[in-house]
Amino acid sequence: MTRTVLVLNSGSSSVKYAVLEPDSGVLIADGIVERIGQEGGAHDHAAAMRGVFDSLAADGHHLEDLGLVAVGHRVVHGGPDLYRPTIVDETVIDRLKELGPLAPLHNPPAVLGIEVARDALPDLPHVAVFDTAFFHDLPAAAATYAIDAEVARDWNIRRYGFHGTSHQYVSEQAAAFLDVPLESLSQIVLHLGNGASVSAIVGGRPVETSMGLTPMEGLVMGTRSGDVDPGVIFYLWREAGMPVEDIESMLNRRSGVRGLGGEIDFRELHRRIESGDDAAELAYEVYIHRLRKYIGAYLAILGSADVITFTAGVGENDAVVRRDALTGLAAFGIEIDEHLNDSPGRGARRISADGAPTTVLVIPTDEELAIARACTGVLGARPGDG
């Protein structure tokens, strides 16, 4: 029987799932159970997990017939010591709970999802795959914050980076698409979704990334501010009397493109700009300005880029964002072919002009497949496993 992996991404109000064949890359089934704890939705995560199984069965995919060999769990933050795909046991769960404050929006529901899934599928190995893992070995100059060294050491404060599963997968796919060794490439990967990050990768290893201790640092995102002067936080706390929890919520949920323009759907944002909406236009300009700022910084770090790749929802589907991000960079060897960029397409594709020194690609990310393959990789490495 073909072996498969169930991949789960458990959030506070939803559970996304996918069943894949890691060897072939075939997606057997996927879906999402939403509105957990809300009216009309699943009562709790245990009910949501039953909803996953019910949805699979309704599509003719019964658990006992799927050939499942593992359950893979996306976990956003692995902290300083969880940086490889890890088989989950009680010790790992306890450690993940300790790491909750580093990713308060993401880690606690992920842990809850792991616990529920282990109860539901106790005979399968459960593997945690961490967004931070790819960036564990960032150069010290990139990973270190210029704060009191003793405080940073005592509290494990460093730049961890996120979306690592996506950045690694896309950088490897770029090399495969170009049919050149990964080790030979200097790359910039732009993961542009509701959450957004950029990485600089040399020879398959990251040398810089935009997110830091938490997923709040870096680019302007759908609802997150990205880079902000820490003084803003102190000012709002002292002068506006805002509790720290309210400031954190604002920076996570009511900032970014939504905070400036009241909208996170870029299709609607473009429509509003065309209709003369000043707030939407400013939100977009701030978003693009920050994106170009990071691209320029990473070009300086790399010296030059062999490949720049766009991925995730906005990166894969918004030709205007891609054009505006790279306009005027011909002096750096970066030119987009307008026709290729504007042409709808599926799968990996080149959008750079013929003869341009830097190849610009659009590559769909597939974090679920990467997680599934990470699961079978760690299982295959266990003593006694084939």
Curated annotation (Swiss-Prot):
GO biological process, one term: acetyl-CoA biosynthetic process
UniProt keyword terms in alphabetical order: ATP-binding, Cytoplasm, Kinase, Magnesium, Metal-binding, Nucleotide-binding, Transferase
Location of the protein in the cell: Cytoplasm
CDD domains documented for this protein: ASKHA_NBD_AcK_PK (cd24010)
Binding site for Mg(2+): N9, E367
Catalytic activity, reaction form: acetate + ATP = acetyl phosphate + ADP
Positions contributing to substrate binding: R74
Pfam families, sorted: Acetate_kinase
Binding site for ATP: K16, H191, L192, G193, N194, G195, D265, F266, R267, G313, V314, G315, E316, N317
EC numbers, comma separated: 2.7.2.1
GO annotation, cellular component aspect: cytoplasm
Known cofactor(s): Mg(2+); Mn(2+)
Cofactor note: Mg(2+). Can also accept Mn(2+).
Positions bearing the site annotation: Transition state stabilizer: H163, R224
Protein task: Catalyzes the formation of acetyl phosphate from acetate and ATP. Can also catalyze the reverse reaction.
Subunit note: Homodimer.
Similarity-based family: Belongs to the acetokinase family.
Protein name in the entry: Acetate kinase
Protein species of origin: Mycolicibacterium gilvum (strain PYR-GCK)
Top-level taxonomy: Bacteria, Bacillati, Actinomycetota, Actinomycetes, Mycobacteriales
